[in-house]
Amino acid sequence: AARTGAEIVAPDAIYDVKADIYAPCALGATLNPQTLDRITAKAVVGAANNQLATADIGQKLFERGVLYAPDYVVNGGGIINVASELNARNTGGAYDAAWVETKLSRLMETLDEVLERSASEGRPTHEIADAIAEARINAARADKAEQLKAA
């Protein structure tokens, strides 16, 4: 902290720190009725799961002009990396950096789509991300059903 000029604060005081970005990376539901009005950041970008205690918190962030990058889009890179590591371990193959990079590029495209659609549709990012995820899951289910019919 001394080298960068950062200030160390108690965990519960983090919500009151003036910052550009709030990055919840450990505990879920840190964006809740008790903390929402204390956060002054203009963006929330973190890797913790389930950052929004309730969906209406995402709506309130949107109404305040706070950019919220949905947690499962932000932390998807970790899952992608682990998938490649596990595949290499389970198959005796090598870690596939090219596959990881391709998937990460698609993840960035998804985040771009979430942000662009949020702006153009006037809807919170968490709603857009959920809609994209549901559409992809439904498409995968339909593809699987077609494969099973063909088998």
Regions found by a protein language model. Name each.
Residues 1-70:
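Rossmann-like adenosine-cofactor binding region
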